[in-house]
Amino acid sequence: MTERPPSEAARSDPQLEGQDAAEARMAPPHLVLLNGVAKETSRAAPAEPPVIELGARSGAGGGPASGGGAARDLKGRDAVAAEARLRVPTTELCRPPGPAPAPAPASAPAELPGDGRMVQLSPPALAAPAGPGRALLYSLSQPLASLGSGFFGEPDAFPMFTNNNRVKRRPSPYEMEISDGPHTKVVRRIFTNSRERWRQQNVNGAFAELRKLIPTHPPDKKLSKNEILRLAMKYINFLAKLLNDQEEEGTQRAKPGKDPVVGAGGGGAGGGIPPEDLLQDVLSPNSSCGSSLDGAASPDSYTEEPTPKHTSRSLHPALLPAADGAGPR
């Protein structure tokens, strides 16, 4: 608002009458209240500002004594109070709990240009419990933040709970170490179980295949893993000895001065009997290998007893009739 000279303001303003003129004379220096607007004048001001009684507004004789400037003053104060009541204080949960700040902005508009007093307006009734309610919310949220689990943030944010002393002091089934969560333990346990199961299946499959290669008198005889290994070693040693005997007989038949009895037998590798049939007859229950396989394993079963070479060479002619006849296989 631009300022005007006193002479121009005097010409443009309407003349004050009655109580308005008296109140204008008692206004502060160089200020006149007209419709709630202060204007400059050259009149002198009284020593003290007037005190307006609130009860004079509703009195029966509220004529010239209570009208005019007093009514405008009361209207201005009512507007300021209504504006302060419309302001709703907001509660911010992100701030730490503390005493509620004093409503400083609400008291600023209470100062009027024509009056030296200040009116202290109290906040609305709903704003009073805002402070305790905020403190209650923070008191409830502090135990949740102190749990220190992976759902509330990184464990480094709570260094006082990273130690295992809390778990040792109050052990319970729902507490755990923060450094090693349940997800890591479950994954490790599943991986270990699957790896052990796969290894056991491979071992069982290998023993089953080895059991099929070992001949026994009842073909479906139940054998333990230890028995399967012992019989497999005996069977391998017997086959190696049989091959050595066949090679020796072949070399002796090729010599010119060979015994005719041994040559007539034809029990070498060059005979008419296939090697597969010979091996089956050797592993029959009547043979020495079959009886040793069905019998109990002795401590010295891992080593073969040394036998003379002529005994080994005479093994095959004795087995030939059993192969040609109807001997068991």
Curated annotation (Swiss-Prot):
GO terms for biological process: angiogenesis; astrocyte fate commitment; basophil differentiation; cell fate commitment; central nervous system neuron differentiation; definitive hemopoiesis; embryonic hemopoiesis; erythrocyte differentiation. Residues 317-329 have a biased composition (Low complexity). Keywords: Chromosomal rearrangement, Developmental protein, Differentiation, DNA-binding, Nucleus, Phosphoprotein, Proto-oncogene, Transcription, Transcription regulation, Ubl conjugation. Residues 58-70, 263-273 have a biased composition (Gly residues). One of its GO terms (cellular component) is nucleus. Residues 1-28, 40-78, 91-125, 247-329 are annotated as: Disordered. The modification Phosphoserine is found at residues 12, 122, 172. Erythroid and myeloid cells. Residues 96-106 have a biased composition (Pro residues). Disulfide bonds: none annotated. It is found in: Nucleus. One of its GO terms (molecular function) is RNA polymerase II-specific DNA-binding transcription factor binding. Residues 187-239 form the bHLH domain. Pfam families: HLH (PF00010). Phosphorylated on serine residues. Phosphorylation of Ser-122 by MAPK is strongly stimulated by hypoxia. Its main location: nucleus. SMART domains: HLH. Efficient DNA binding requires dimerization with another bHLH protein. Forms heterodimers with TCF3. Binds to the LIM domain containing protein LMO2 and to DRG1. Can assemble in a complex with LDB1 and LMO2. Component of a TAL-1 complex composed at least of CBFA2T3, LDB1, TAL1 and TCF3. Interacts with SBNO2; this interaction inhibits TAL1 occupancy of the DCSTAMP promoter, leading to the activation of the DCSTAMP promoter by the transcription factor MITF. Implicated in the genesis of hemopoietic malignancies. It may play an important role in hemopoietic differentiation. Serves as a positive regulator of erythroid differentiation. The helix-loop-helix domain is necessary and sufficient for the interaction with DRG1. This is T-cell acute lymphocytic leukemia protein 1 homolog. It comes from Mus musculus (Mouse). The lineage of its organism: Eukaryota, Metazoa, Chordata, Craniata, Vertebrata.
